[in-house]
Amino acid sequence: CYDVAHYLSEKDCGSYIVTSGGELLKFIDKKKVKIIKLPVHSKNPLIIFINFLALICVILINNISIVHARSRAPAWSCLLAAKITGRKFVTTFHGTYNFNSKIKKFYNSVMVRSDLIIAGSNFIFSHIKENYAKYLDAKKKLLVIFRGINVDYFDSTTKLDSDEKKLLKEWQIEKDKKIILLPGRLTGWKGQEIFIEAINLVNIELGYEAFFAVILGSDQGRDLYKKKLIRLTEQHRLVNQVKFIDHCKDMALAYKVSDVVVSASIEPEAF
């Protein structure tokens, strides 16, 4: 989101981000992109309605022509505000969004009620066609736009040895051992349990002193799941080898210091 906002600014297009806050705010150039704080994270119907009214003001005051939403709760506010003001509405559908009831599916459907629907992958494109076909019509455009990366940021040659040493010190890891990294928030479908089981098998082959495994990601309040993972490492006697790191502000550096980076997801990734 902030990459697109900066790009638009560089092309002399006014760019605004409405947000309730977050870690990425510190990376936004406030001279190029205007930040507007609203409680758009809330799923409370009353707050969604208040946000809708506030967005009407934001759109009209700043003469905004395109409204883009990436999450369901704010998308409802954006949909209503765009309709009232006659602006184009775009959504990025970037998750499968569980639906166990008709009410939940209706709530999710806001992501396909826009003028243009962006699917983050072929998998998500198929998911939309299979599950939300009745909300699609000839007037709506659905296309796949793969998520890009900042190749300059992820250029390993720009990382200093001193930065690597500092990160390893923070992680309490000695670089004389191989590092196996599993990045991603702590949630069952990301495959952390399978990763730990696999690390145990590697241990049997290589020995306990051969490497460190780093599980990098926040539990986002899933305390019980994290405790389950810790118990699993204890069960396999991996406590001294498997490290849980909540957050890393420089993921490019995390990849650089790692010898192997693992994706262990047990369900299709949205991107």
Where are the language model's segments positioned?
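A short helix/loop element that forms part of the nucleotide-sugar donor recognition site in Leloir-type
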Residues: A133, D155-I173, K228-I230
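Glycosyltransferase donor-sugar binding loop
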Residues: I17-E23, I149, P183, F212-K227
